């Protein structure tokens, strides 16, 4: 469990502190998609949390 947590922390740190992550801009033709693109990195975390909710629903069998 500790290894998985460490891997998640490393992935989040590399995503948050990479210089291209915050300063990359979409081409002007796709500017209307900016709000969607801002939310997209969070979507995998929802699946991660869903796994815990699912296991809680089946009593962690």
Swiss-Prot record:
Keywords: Chloroplast, Membrane, Photosynthesis, Photosystem II, Plastid, Reaction center, Thylakoid, Transmembrane, Transmembrane helix. It is found in: Plastid, Chloroplast thylakoid membrane. The keyword Ribosomal protein does not apply. It is a single-pass membrane protein. It comes from the Eukaryota. GO terms for biological process: photosynthesis. The keyword Nucleotide-binding does not apply. Residues 1-24 form a propeptide. Pfam families: PsbK (PF02533). InterPro entries: PSII_PsbK, PSII_PsbK_sf. GO terms for cellular component: chloroplast thylakoid membrane; photosystem II reaction center. PANTHER family: PHOTOSYSTEM II REACTION CENTER PROTEIN K (PTHR35325:SF1), PTHR35325. NCBIfam families: PRK02553.1. One of the components of the core complex of photosystem II (PSII). PSII is a light-driven water:plastoquinone oxidoreductase that uses light energy to abstract electrons from H(2)O, generating O(2) and a proton gradient subsequently used for ATP formation. It consists of a core antenna complex that captures photons, and an electron transfer chain that converts photonic excitation into a charge separation. This is Photosystem II reaction center protein K.
């Amino acid at each position: 469990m500790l290894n998985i947590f460490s891997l998640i922390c490393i992935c989040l740190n590399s995503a948050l502190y990479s210089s291209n992550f915050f300063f990359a801009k979409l081409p002007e033709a796709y500017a209307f998609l900016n709000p969607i693109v801002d939310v997209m990195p969070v979507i995998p975390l929802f699946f991660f949390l869903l796994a815990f909710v699912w296991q809680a629903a089946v009593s962690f069998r």
